[in-house]
């Protein structure tokens, strides 16, 4: 690879809550065109600020205030000021996420000597925990509404969304109700975007008309490569997304060079230990042993999800049209009343609030199944 890379932009992606510990997920764009997801805590940012002051005393204004170029990281009192009267750790966490994003952007906008220093490059480089294929049990990921940019609005309305929802297709026709008690009819081969997966087997999906509904997971399967909602070919999403557990330097022309934490698309797998991958605008071979399913990146981008016993991303065939006459998939047992909401965070429950349920069942729907959150 030509020269060391350095971060060029940082964007706040999500608030990750693990029991009582809050960490902040960021999407980091690098000088080589790649992007990675990292998680950092508030204390880690405070330690970064301290290290920068020791490493760059002039830029920190320790000798003369007029020479200061390092941005300030507001303290706890300044952070809580815009949130007076508001209740909840989630609101404060989202405010911190916005504040840390602003601080990170200002750091990268300082002098090149500081912005490209090993201190900042190392801080935003993926760490072993960032490369884990799954978040710790009990983790909650809270996404801020995209349009809520100002800090003063960070504790406002929230929404469940995906940065890039995964598109799955329906195996057979199925009728249920959406989150507003309207008929939700899915046809065979229809593409649905998965917004939220729940262990009960009922997933929150969205159709082309922007209707959202709880839908049985056995009725869904991965769409064929290049057959998204728009129906056009897309090399950028032609395979599952994996993460490089460590850096790799190519030794042949048909191989790829990737840094640690690089997110690659697997175009073709092989039992010989080398997979054909796409990284940026280049395609080449990578050792399969270096690749692992994404954890946080998959959750935030909605891609790379592999279910069942297929964690290694092995190629799977797609059913022929004649298989549409096969017996309908088994519908999972609906959870007990309130089971899904009890497993969701407060943000999710608020996003799923709806009008009072109407009486009667929708017309033209055979064996209509209410979504699990509407049972009384």
From Swiss-Prot:
**Keyword field contains Repeat:** yes
Provide the alphabetized UniProt keywords. Answer: Cell membrane, Lipid-binding, Membrane, Repeat, SH3 domain
Write down the InterPro entries for this protein, in alphabetical order.
Answer: NADPH_Oxidase/PX-Domain, NoxO1_SH3_2, PX_dom, PX_dom_sf, SH3-like_dom_sf, SH3_domain
SUPFAM superfamilies found in the cross-reference section: PX domain (SSF64268), SH3-domain (SSF50044)
Q: Name one GO molecular function term.
A: enzyme binding
Q: What processes does the entry annotate via GO biological process terms?
A: extracellular matrix disassembly; regulation of hydrogen peroxide metabolic process; regulation of respiratory burst; superoxide anion generation
Fetch the Pfam families from UniProt: SH3_1
Give the region (Disordered) as residue ranges. 302-376
GO terms under cellular component: cytoplasm; NADPH oxidase complex; plasma membrane
Q: Where is the PX domain?
A: 1-131
Please describe the organ and tissue distribution of this protein's expression: Expressed in testis, small and large intestines, liver, kidney and pancreas. Isoform 3 is mainly expressed in colon. Isoform 1 is preferentially expressed in testis.
Renumbered to this chain, region (Proline-rich region) spans 328-337
Could you describe the subunit structure of this protein? Interacts with NOX1, NOXA1, CYBA/p22phox and NCF2/p67phox. Interacts with SH3PXD2A and SH3PXD2B.
Task of the protein: Constitutively potentiates the superoxide-generating activity of NOX1 and NOX3 and is required for the biogenesis of otoconia/otolith, which are crystalline structures of the inner ear involved in the perception of gravity. Isoform 3 is more potent than isoform 1 in activating NOX3. Together with NOXA1, may also substitute to NCF1/p47phox and NCF2/p67phox in supporting the phagocyte NOX2/gp91phox superoxide-generating activity.
Q: Which PANTHER family match?
A: NADPH OXIDASE ORGANIZER 1 (PTHR15706:SF10), SH3 MULTIPLE DOMAIN (PTHR15706)
Instruction: Quote the protein name from its UniProt record.
Output: NADPH oxidase organizer 1
């Amino acid at each position: 690879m030509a020269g060391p890379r350095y971060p060029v932009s940082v964007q706040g992606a999500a608030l990750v809550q693990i029991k009582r510990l809050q960490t902040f997920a960021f999407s980091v764009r690098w000088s080589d065109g790649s992007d990675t997801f990292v998680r950092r805590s508030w204390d880690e940012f405070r330690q970064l600020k301290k290290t920068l002051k020791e490493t760059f005393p002039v830029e920190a204004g320790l000798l003369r205030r007029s020479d200061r170029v390092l941005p300030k990281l507001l303290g706890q009192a300044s952070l809580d000021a815009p949130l007076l009267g508001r209740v909840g750790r989630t609101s404060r966490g989202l405010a911190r996420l916005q504040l840390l994003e602003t601080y990170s952007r200002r750091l990268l906008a300082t002098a090149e000597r500081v912005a490209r220093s090993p201190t900042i490059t190392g801080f935003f480089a993926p760490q072993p925990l960032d490369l884990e294929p799954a978040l710790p049990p009990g983790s909650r990921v809270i996404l801020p509404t995209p349009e809520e940019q100002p800090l003063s609005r960070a504790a406002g309305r929230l929404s469940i969304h995906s940065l890039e929802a995964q598109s799955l297709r329906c195996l057979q026709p199925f009728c249920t109700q959406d989150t507003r008690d309207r008929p939700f009819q899915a046809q065979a081969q229809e593409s649905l975007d998965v917004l939220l997966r729940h262990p009960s087997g009922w997933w929150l999906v969205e159709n082309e008309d922007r209707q959202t509904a709880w839908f049985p997971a056995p009725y869904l399967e991965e769409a064929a490569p290049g057959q998204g909602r728009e129906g056009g070919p897309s090399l950028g999403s032609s395979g599952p997304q994996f993460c490089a557990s460590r850096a790799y330097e190519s030794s042949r022309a048909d191989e790829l060079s990737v840094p640690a934490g690089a997110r690659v698309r697997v175009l073709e797998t092989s039992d010989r230990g080398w997979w054909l991958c796409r990284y940026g605008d280049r395609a080449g071979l990578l050792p399969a042993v270096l690749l692992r399913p994404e954890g946080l990146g998959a959750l935030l981008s909605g891609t790379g999800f592999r279910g069942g016993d297929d964690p290694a991303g092995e190629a799977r065939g797609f059913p022929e049209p004649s298989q549409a006459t096969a017996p309908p998939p088994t519908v999972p047992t609906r959870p007990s009343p309130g089971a899904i909401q009890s497993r969701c965070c407060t943000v999710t429950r608020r996003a799923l609030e709806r009008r009072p349920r109407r009486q009667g069942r929708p017309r033209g729907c055979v064996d209509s199944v209410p979504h699990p959150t509407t049972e009384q």
